[in-house]
UniProtKB/Swiss-Prot annotation:
Protein's organism: Serratia proteamaculans (strain 568)
Site annotation Positions MEP for the nucleophilic attack: residues: R160, K216
Catalyses which reaction(s): 2-C-methyl-D-erythritol 4-phosphate + CTP + H(+) = 4-CDP-2-C-methyl-D-erythritol + diphosphate
Physiological role: Catalyzes the formation of 4-diphosphocytidyl-2-C-methyl-D-erythritol from CTP and 2-C-methyl-D-erythritol 4-phosphate (MEP).
The name this protein goes by in its record: 2-C-methyl-D-erythritol 4-phosphate cytidylyltransferase
Gene3D superfamilies: Spore Coat Polysaccharide Biosynthesis Protein SpsA, Chain A (3.90.550.10)
Keyword terms, alphabetized: Isoprene biosynthesis, Nucleotidyltransferase, Transferase
Name of the top EC class for this enzyme: transferase
Domain of life where this protein originates: Bacteria
Assigned EC number: 2.7.7.60
Pathway: Isoprenoid biosynthesis; isopentenyl diphosphate biosynthesis via DXP pathway; isopentenyl diphosphate from 1-deoxy-D-xylulose 5-phosphate: step 2/6
BP-aspect Gene Ontology terms: isopentenyl diphosphate biosynthetic process, methylerythritol 4-phosphate pathway
Family classification: Belongs to the IspD/TarI cytidylyltransferase family. IspD subfamily.
Length: 235
């Protein structure tokens, strides 16, 4: 892997970390659960800061968050903090406001600690040739079922060809993401990730194949799986 290859300009990273993660059934927001000697959030931040093209990570935390500033990573001069909102889009937008004159911004889930350096490098290398950006994604491998509306019964099988699991990081031109995110919010569109905001405005971001072990810790059983994957990364 060659971090010096290419001419991609510096990238500012934004991590929306204002959520509470109720599905984890934990006593604290999921991003503050510990794997090894670090929180999930710290693992996610370190995965980005290891790349030389990412000089700064902006973390959007909840207004009542008392935990982030207690973490060692909070003292890193490359890490900035802002207050996020109730929705992911609000937190991302708050982070974008601090990105200054950066041309490109990368958004990564705070609860996605298992990012491989090779995936990040591939995303940067491929997306630098795009005018609209792109996302890490993994092709769907399982059989997909559509449920009947409001019921736990199968309606039909969904053809999995051309279906992808959206992952993060997601990388876009800063000005374009701000424009599309604001328009989607103003229109009341559902914004589940940053790519969906660009889709709302008629753009077609790139799909960059990434590893399926880049999981988002969402449920209690994900914690042990993430710990295993991180062990493999360390080795």
């Amino acid at each position: 892997m060659n971090h010096s290859a290419g001419t991609f300009p510096p990238v500012i990273a934004v991590l929306p970390a204002a959520g509470i993660g109720s599905r984890m059934q934990a006593d604290c927001p999921k991003q503050y659960l510990t794997i090894g000697h670090q929180t999930i959030l710290e693992h996610a931040i370190h995965a980005l800061l290891r790349h030389p093209r990412i000089p700064q990570v902006i973390v959007a935390i909840g207004p009542d968050d008392q935990q982030f500033h207690q973490l060692p990573i909070a003292k890193d001069p490359r890490v900035r903090v802002t207050v996020g909102g109730q929705q992911r889009a609000d937190s991302v937008m708050a982070g974008l406001q601090l990105a200054g004159e950066a041309k490109w911004v990368l958004v990564h889930d705070a609860a996605r600690p298992c990012l491989h350096a090779e995936d990040l490098e591939r995303l940067l290398a491929i997306t630098e040739h795009s005018e609209v950006g792109g996302i890490l994604a993994a092709p769907v491998r399982d059989t997909m079922k559509r449920a009947e509306p409001g019921r736990s019964t199968i309606s039909h099988t969904v053809e999995r060809q051309d279906l992808w699991h959206a992952l993060t990081p997601q990388l876009f031109p800063l000005a374009l993401l701000k424009l599309c995110l604001q328009r989607a919010m103003d229109d009341g569109a559902t914004v589940t990730d940053e790519a969906s905001a660009l889709e709302h405005c008629g753009y077609h971001p790139l799909l960059v194949s990434g590893r399926s072990d880049n999981i988002k810790v969402t449920r209690p059983e994900d914690l042990a799986l993430a710990a295993f994957y991180l062990t493999q990364l360390d080795n």
